[in-house]
Amino acid sequence: MHSLTRIKVLQRRCTVFHSQCESILLRYQDEDRGLQAEEEAILEQIAGLKLLLDTLRAENRQLSREEIYTLLRKQSIVRRQIKDLELQIIQIQEKRSELEKKREEFQKKSKYWLRKEGNYQRWIIRQKRFYIQREIQQEEAESEEII
């Protein structure tokens, strides 16, 4: 039974490692949801700024030089804000890509530990069957000696 005890220890260790990987995967999933929500919020901001930019056009109006400069300045500010938000989206997408790579890595580790745990479980079952068969054979041998 000594080897059976060792196998059970190894199986428990695999279970712990597997559950750690699963908790990390859940944390990554939550982080990805947060980044996705942030990206969607920024996209909404960009859409709003583009609408604002459309309203800042000098369509068939007589404008003084100051009004033209003011309008151009406002358009420039809005365009700059749009570019900044687009840059933030790129950064978020890069973070999500890195997160996806980490998630895939931990998924592989999780599957590895789950597979090892299953192997140890099957080994435990085989060992128990072996011990039971050996006990039955010993009992049969003892009963034959008695007869």
Curated annotation (Swiss-Prot):
Alphabetic keyword roster: Virulence
Keyword check for Disulfide bond: no
Keyword hit for Transport: no
Recorded superkingdom: Bacteria
Protein family according to the UniProt entry: Belongs to the SpaM family.
Role noted for this protein: Involved in a secretory pathway responsible for the surface presentation of determinants needed for the entry of Salmonella species into mammalian cells.
Official protein name in the record: Surface presentation of antigens protein SpaM
Organism of derivation: Salmonella typhimurium (strain LT2 / SGSC1412 / ATCC 700720)
Gene this protein is translated from: spaM
